Structure formats: C-alpha cells, structure tokens
Amino acid sequence: MKKNFLIVMCLMMALMASAQDLVVCSYNIRNANRGDAKNGNGWEKRSVYMCQQIQFEDPGVFGCQEVKKEQIDDMLRLMPEYAYVGVGREDGKDGGEYSPVFYKKDRYKLLDSGTFWLAEDPTKAELGWDAACKRVCSWGHFKDLKTKHTFYFFNTHMDHIGVTARREGAKLIVSKMRELMKKNDPVILTGDFNVDQRSEPFQVFINSGFLNDCYEVSKYRFATNGTFNDFNPLNCSNSRIDHIFVSKSFKVDRYAIRTDGYWDNVEMYEAKPSPNAPMEVKLKEGVRRNPSDHYPVVVKMRF
C-alpha cells in the first residue's frame, strides 16, 4: 500500500512538473531618442516603469523590438535575472536596433541561437525587397531546466513601409522555422509585425500549418485595446499589430494586452474631489503616460 502511494505521488509530481506554466511576452519598447524626451517620454524615465511592469508579469522568455544596445544594457541592469540573444540589424554586431530574446538565466539553458535578416539573402545585413529599414529575426533554442522541455523562440520586427517585404519576410520566417525545428520541437514567435490581424502576412503565419494566434486560441482573454498607442493613453483601436504565435502543441490559457501606465508630474495640480470622496484622501492631478508607444502582449500557456 505504501509502495503504491509513493508511485502515485511520484507520477503526480511528474505530471505537475511537465505542465508548469510558461509566461511569454512581446514588447516593442520604443527606441531611445531625443524627440521622445522632449515630449516627456524619454527612455531614462519610462525605462524604470517598463522594467517594473515586465518583472511583475514575470515572463520566462520574452521578445522586444526597437531595442538599441544602450537600452539592452539598461534592461539587464534593472532586470539582472535575464540574459539575451540577438544582434544589431545594421551590422550584425552592436549597430542599430535589435530584436532580442530575453530569458531567465536560472530557468532556461540556451542550446543555440542566431539571427537572420528579412531579405533576399538572409545572411547579409541588407535591405530586403521594398523595405525602408534593415530588419532581422533573432531566435533561441532553449531547455527548461525544471521540466526538461525544449522549445524555439523567434522574435522579429517587420518593416513599416514595405508591403512586399512584410509578405516575403513572413514566408522567410516560416521557412526558417521549419528548417531549424527538430523532432517537432514547440515554437514561439513574437514580434511587432506592423500589420494587424486582417493582413496578408498574418495569414501567412496562420496558414503555416503549425502556428496558432494566441489571441484566437486562448481560453481567457483580456484585450480592451489594440497594441499601438502612440504614447497617448487615450488612443484606442482594435488593430493588433504585435502578435504572439505558438505551435499547436501549446495549450494557451491566458492572453492580455496590458495597458498599464504611470503618472507623471503628480505634484503639479490640486485635484477637486467629488462630494462623496473620502476626506482623508488628498488627491493630486497628474499626467498619465505609457511606458512605450506600444502595449505589451502577455500570454500564459502550457506545454
């Protein structure tokens, strides 16, 4: 009897370990530039809130877009539990924006990684098709040290101008996924695709035969806005241009577009409370700001 009990307990523990949640995120953090700083949205200020937001969501792995090297350095300083893979799109080193994949160092072992350009020759740092900018897709092959599961994680930022570049870039990413995936390893794709759920590139991924849109297949969904906000908390749309796609082996439990913001200059104005407001509360008016001009997409799922 005791032996049977121990066997059952071991089986239950094994099942619990294999079904542990994986939280992933896609976040266009907006490149650091002087123009944003003049408008009150400088990286030095918003980066602190953005990293606090990421740490609260606690993703095991996440993809970012528009990231410059100095921003990566700041993020690693503020979130030392993470490491990253990826290179700058201009030269394959430190130049220009990255599309990095961040991962928790104590939870995941990096097995392999790489970057390819969304271009006719994906091995060269050059413009692809009708693109206005060089574009990359960075990827990592990871092993979960707790569950022993392995998976691929791809992250990209498609062109904002080139229609052909987006379509052909989507086809290239699907092709590279098929080329790299071994033994049907699960795969995750995050990114700012600069097109929404009604677009041709979106359909390329959906019709790949092995990818699902997390928004569509999630059991629970909290998405009251689109993913681009232009640094204005009042802006609203139903366009999701930041996406998370996963292979069909994943069970997606929760999907959210997180519209959290922060308050700036809260000491500038006295607020006029309503007649029913608690007298003990002294209110101030402030400026509501977003940590980026995109909202992060957060997904909770299981293998």
Describe each model-derived feature in a short phrase.
Residues 31-40, 111, 163, 222-225:
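Short, solvent-exposed loop/turn elements at domain surfaces
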Residues 63-65, 86-87, 188-192, 212-216:
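Active-site neighborhood of phospho(di)ester-bond hydrolases with catalytic His/Asp-centered motifs
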Residues 61-154, 158, 254-259:
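Structured beta-strand-rich core segments of catalytic domains in phosphoester-bond hydrolases
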Residues 164, 178-187, 195-303:
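Metal-dependent phosphoester-hydrolase catalytic domains
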Residues 27-29, 156-158, 192-193, 295:
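Active-site metal-binding loops of divalent metal-dependent hydrolases
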Residues 134-154, 166-205:
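His/acidic metal-ligating clusters that form di-metal
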Residues 1-21:
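Bacterial Sec-dependent N-terminal signal peptides
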Residues 17-79, 89-97, 171, 289, ...:
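N-terminal, active-site-proximal structural segment of metallo-dependent hydrolase catalytic domains
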